[in-house]
């Protein structure tokens, strides 16, 4: 996919995140798994991000494929994530998937929750 085509997507999936998903799927030996990102109520800022592995793509789900792995977002969560990016980081504070969300007006210190 070209960079221009990626920019047109409602949510981006970085190379770092896709690479980590690929590694985890190889360890699980289950190519049917996809990384699902979702938004739920809660956290210190009102909404929080969640990540899970899921074998299913439900009707209406949005998917992005990169490096042979898929990111899946349900329609309700996608409305809060449009223009965002799912990334992965590893450092002194630990390793995690995270969302860069331009729609968030405030975020908590750890970046796991936000408000719009």
UniProtKB/Swiss-Prot annotation:
Molecular function as annotated in GO: 2 iron, 2 sulfur cluster binding; 4 iron, 4 sulfur cluster binding; iron ion binding
Any one of the GO BP annotations: iron-sulfur cluster assembly
Cofactor note: Binds 1 iron-sulfur cluster per subunit.
Gene3D superfamilies referenced in this protein's UniProt entry, alphabetically: HesB-like domain
Subunit text: Homodimer.
Role noted for this protein: Required for insertion of 4Fe-4S clusters for at least IspG.
NCBIfam families (alphabetical): iron-sulfur cluster assembly accessory protein, PRK13623.1
Name of protein: Iron-sulfur cluster insertion protein ErpA
Organism: Shewanella pealeana (strain ATCC 700345 / ANG-SQ1)
